[in-house]
Amino acid sequence: MWQRMSEMQAHNIALLIDADNVDPNGIDSVLTVLAELGQVNIRRAYGNWAKDALKRWGDITNRYGIRPHQQFDLTRGKNATDMAMTIDAVDLLYQGKVDGFGIM
């Protein structure tokens, strides 16, 4: 289905990151793999940025041009971040802005 960039026209890829549950140290390898599939022109990280646990993402978002999306924890046991990512993914696909996704 997907081919390497050298064998095809450029695909637009969106990288959506669940920053509440993912270690930022893996971002380099993820972007390397996605770059072989297309151009990662949408980069978003979702989470509750008021939490100390997400402070480690600060330098990473700046270095890699990742746009932080604030998602408050309104209820316990529900994952609002997952829902926000899902809604944005469907919206991006519907608008025709992307050809594929990288989900972290």
Task: Describe the role of every protein-language-model region.
Residues 2-99:
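Domain-level signal for Mg2+-assisted phosphodiester chemistry and nucleotide/NA-binding surfaces
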Residues 104:
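Active-site histidine-anchored catalytic micro-motif
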